[in-house]
């Protein structure tokens, strides 16, 4: 089921799910990320889980810690609904899960159960997974050819919500229509006459952000950027000039996990692993340690959607790097430095095991989460969203840019702020 913003996809899915439950039909609700599952649960009024949590099971310690196999599907005669399916990829840099292809594993898991059906829900105008041009889970022809499945497809196109009253929806629709037409001529965004969309200059930004933190709360306010470099600058400015944080890392800070971690969840009953994209609040900052050429701090974290607080070593170096997480070169450097501690272990296999169990080697990789890239924001929604367009050269407005902008626009529920958007992109009043 494909549908653009405002076409009633959310309302329709909620109605279908709840009608099925009234007929005592088994349903399972899934989404690619924890935040997307939270949004899905919120509008359907039913529990929703991440795909990973539902379909994978960790191997025992003897087989390999942090390795997840496809689990047993005990559901029969069940409809599996998967929201935000545009985010589901074919391949992964993280091969710790199943075959390494989330789409392959999801389909295999669902149909391993007797008489199950799968409903994939998403918006084809959003950003596809990194590294591909389209979202494979929303391509009916691809699914039919690749998996030999019979596909029934519905595409919601008519705007059902009143876009005349919503600047967010009105402009998102205009951007999406440009994507659909394959035309990337100059698009003018309409701000005048809409109370929910506001242009903000650099000089007004901090005051507006501070006001949103007061009105909507920090957890319901997000800045979305084009790059990690820009997000770092915003995070630095917000911490220093709004939150008045003098230390490089403080209690109360909002952070995002930027790499899956299988080490620190092991001692907690309800935590299989800590996921890339999870947002956490720093509850307590413990001792600092400089080791192996990197900086670590022992930290207690309250992670969004988790029942228990987690105590772990976190790596501070990733807070300011312009890469999404620790680079391959730095990871290699850390590995070799840790290995030096175990050179007295003659067996390479035993030495490797020691490194894999080293708590600093397994430190959580984090970034501040007051501002994030659009890929990191995908699947989530916030009451107030600030969009930083970054560099706005003429040749930068290609298909990827408009998908980026559409995805960023549709993260906002109540208020959208356009930071330093050029006059040439804004429709003149009157």
Name the predicted role of every residue range.
Residues 110-116, 124-283, 287-326:
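Conserved helicase motor core of P-loop NTPases
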């Amino acid at each position: 089921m494909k549908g653009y913003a405002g076409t009633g996809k959310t309302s329709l899915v909620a109605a279908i799910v709840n009608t099925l439950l009234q007929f005592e039909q088994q349903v399972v609700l899934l989404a690619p990320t924890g935040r997307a599952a939270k949004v899905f649960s919120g509008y359907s009024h039913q529990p929703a889980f991440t795909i990973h949590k539902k379909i994978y099971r960790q191997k025992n310690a003897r087989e390999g810690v942090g390795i997840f196999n496809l689990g047993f599907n005990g559901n029969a005669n069940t409809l599996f609904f998967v929201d935000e399916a545009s985010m589901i990829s074919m391949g992964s840099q993280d091969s710790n899960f199943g075959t390494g292809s989330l789409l392959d594993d999801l389909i295999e898991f669902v149909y391993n159960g007797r008489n199950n059906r799968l409903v994939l829900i998403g918006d084809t105008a959003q950003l596809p997974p990194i590294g591909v041009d389209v979202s494979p889970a929303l391509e009916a022809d691809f699914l039919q050819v690749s998996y030999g499945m019979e596909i029934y497809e519905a595409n919601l196109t008519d705007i059902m919500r009143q876009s005349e009253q919503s600047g967010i929806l009105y402009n998102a629709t205009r951007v999406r229509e440009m994507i659909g037409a394959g035309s990337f001529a100059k698009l003018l965004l309409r701000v005048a006459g809409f109370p929910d969309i506001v242009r903000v200059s650099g000089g007004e930004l901090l005051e507006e952000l501070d006001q949103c933190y007061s009105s909507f709360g920090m957890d319901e306010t997000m800045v979305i950027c084009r790059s990690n470099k820009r997000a770092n600058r915003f995070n630095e400015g917000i911490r220093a000039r709004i939150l008045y944080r003098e230390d490089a890392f403080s209690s109360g800070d909002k952070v995002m996990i930027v790499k899956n971690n299988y080490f620190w969840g092991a001692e907690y009953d309800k935590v299989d692993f800590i996921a890339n994209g999870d947002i956490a609040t720093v509850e307590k900052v413990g001792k600092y340690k400089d080791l192996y050429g990197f900086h670590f701090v022992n930290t207690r974290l309250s992670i969004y959607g988790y029942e228990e607080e987690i105590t772990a070593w976190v790596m501070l170096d990733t807070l300011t790097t312009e890469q999404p997480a620790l680079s391959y070169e730095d990871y290699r450097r850390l590995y070799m430095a840790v290995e030096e501690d175990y050179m007295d272990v003659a067996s390479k296999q035993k030495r490797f095991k020691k490194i894999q169990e080293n708590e600093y080697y397994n430190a959580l990789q984090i970034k501040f989460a007051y501002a994030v890239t659009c890929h990191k924001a995908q699947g989530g929604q916030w009451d107030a969203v600030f969009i930083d367009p970054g560099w706005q050269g003429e040749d930068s407005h290609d298909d990827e840019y408009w998908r980026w902008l559409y995805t960023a626009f549709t993260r906002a529920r109540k208020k959208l702020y356009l930071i330093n958007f050029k006059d040439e992109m804004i429709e003149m009043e009157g």
